[in-house]
């Protein structure tokens, strides 16, 4: 008996290691800590959200974080992937508040620890992204053509808004505008280690007043090249939404 106990004592660390490696499953959890922020600008529609990722039992290497937004009424989807990590701590440079960001990349979450993530996403719809690039390239050329040395900023914007290109692009963007008055579901997918995934579903809604204000971002985005020339900020509507777990209802 003493010999068996001694052998078990020697084997115990190895048994624990084998158990941890092959039998204990990783449990990954996403805990929201910031509101969902909705955007529309020259990059189109996208979101920003923040939280912490918790890994239980084993360390996990997060390979990707993706989001799919679904508009409930017509099931229109907005596919997004992580683009950058935005540090949510304001710093002051020359008296002006600034934030810092870095390109999104895989990271490791140690077992039993919490890893904060504040992610800005970008559309993965390459066809739509290419079209937006074409539109704003032509708008930039239009601005160069209409600018006059004695123009005020309002005169420049009014002249731009009166051009055929501007009106056609505005109508096109209004037609394809994603953020409408409706209910939405966000499917957050975290890919970790090799090909394992964990999904979370949240919901929010946009009311008629918010949708109308959001549509104003189209004209502001088309005219922001003029703002840049006159060095004035472009104030875009960016509503924030609480994380509400989607119960399927």
Each predicted region: which residue ranges?
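Short, solvent-exposed loop/turn segments enriched in Ser/Thr/Gly
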Residues: 44-50, 183-185
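Acidic, serine/threonine- and proline-rich intrinsically disordered appendage/tail regions
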Residues: 156-168, 174-183, 187, 195-249
């Amino acid at each position: 008996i003493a010999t068996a106990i001694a052998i078990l004592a020697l084997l115990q660390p190895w048994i624990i290691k084998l158990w941890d490696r092959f039998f204990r499953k990783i449990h990954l959890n996403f805990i929201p800590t910031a509101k969902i922020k909705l955007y529309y600008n020259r990059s189109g529609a996208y979101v920003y959200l923040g939280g912490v990722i918790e890994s239980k039992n084993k360390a996990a290497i997060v390979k990707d974080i993706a989001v799919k937004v679904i508009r409930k009424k017509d099931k229109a989807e907005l596919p997004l992937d992580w683009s950058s990590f935005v540090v949510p701590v304001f710093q002051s440079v020359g008296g002006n508040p600034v934030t810092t960001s870095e390109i999104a990349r895989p990271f490791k979450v140690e077992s039993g620890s919490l890893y904060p993530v504040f992610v800005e996403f970008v559309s993965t719809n390459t066809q739509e992204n290419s079209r937006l690039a074409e539109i704003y390239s032509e708008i930039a050329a239009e601005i160069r053509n209409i600018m006059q040395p004695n123009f005020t900023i309002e005169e420049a914007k009014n002249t731009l808004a009166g051009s055929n290109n501007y009106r056609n692009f505005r109508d096109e963007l209004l037609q394809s505008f994603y953020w409408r008055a409706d209910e939405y579901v966000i499917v957050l997918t975290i890919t970790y280690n090799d090909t394992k995934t964990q999904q979370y579903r949240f919901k929010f809604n946009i009311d008629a007043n918010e949708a109308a204000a959001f549509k104003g971002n189209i004209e502001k985005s088309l005219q922001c090249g003029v703002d840049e020339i006159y060095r004035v900020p472009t104030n875009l509507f960016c509503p924030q939404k609480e994380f509400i777990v989607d119960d399927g209802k």
